[in-house]
Amino acid sequence: PLRDVYKRQSLARRILTTLQGAGLAPADLGSLFNGDGRIHIGYSGLNHLGWLTSLNVDGVDVLPRLLERPDLIESFEEGRLFGADLVQALGAVPNEYLHYYYYSRDDLAVDRKAEAPRGAFLEAQQNQFYTQAQHTDDVAGLWEATRLEREETYMATNREVSGEFERDEADLETGGYDKVALAIMHAIANDVPAELILNVANHRALPDLPDEAVVEVPCRVDGAGIHRLPTPALPDHARGLVVNTKYVEQRTIDAAVNRSRTAALLALSHHPLVDSVHVAEQLLDDFADAFDGLEYLKDAHA
């Protein structure tokens, strides 16, 4: 998804800007992802489940300079979300969605107290936007206000667990989807190289996963298309979670394609955030009751 690709690029940009501000990285780097070979991001994992493990500038990994400084770690959003102690222990900067895995009990407790689940909030907000858009000449302004509210409340319950900090103004900027989409199109159409973190077929980039699995890794994009760059090995602490989550994704696909309750049960019962087979079974029954076309989820022989 383009929004998430943009966020990986933004994470690297924030880290590099932080190091430049502290005099720990060159100040004359120009555009971060212009494909000139000066900057290489070491990132590997799956969509919503990856770790930034290195940030090479002119052949030198500058990420250890960040990891030595708790004050620098907690100067940007992901660092505040996870805390300097955990980031230093991991030796990598996690994707923000890993908060649900590292702090699952805490996040669940806060989510249960929330006025509404995130999905319900977004559905209501979007419906309100469409209704109001029919009665205003400033649709662009209305959308910007809607988008800003969405960004301001993004991962609000997770931030509550981590100290209730507010998002920085720079993290609220728009342009995620379009910037990445245009960067890819520009690189291909004009044969102007760019380095981006993209979701592509694995093809041995991560040897623990099947070749056909979709992974999130650094790529070079140019007039000849998309090319995987050398991908850092998954950290030891990450390998099990990634392999397990990919198994869940594959069984979910099996369930949908083959209309199989068995595959769906395997998927849900092996998901790290589902703590009981009984819970998985109840979820499947609830899905079957709530959505048309999922009746097969109640067929124990499917």
Give the role of each language-model region.
Residues 1-6:
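Short, small-residue-biased leader/transition segments that mark boundaries at the very start
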Residues 7-8, 46:
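An acidic- and aromatic-residue-enriched active-site/binding cleft used to recognize and process polar
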Residues 8-36, 54:
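Rossmann-like NAD(P)H-binding beta-loop-alpha module
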Residues 32-302:
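Long, compositionally biased stretches enriched for glycine and/or charged residues
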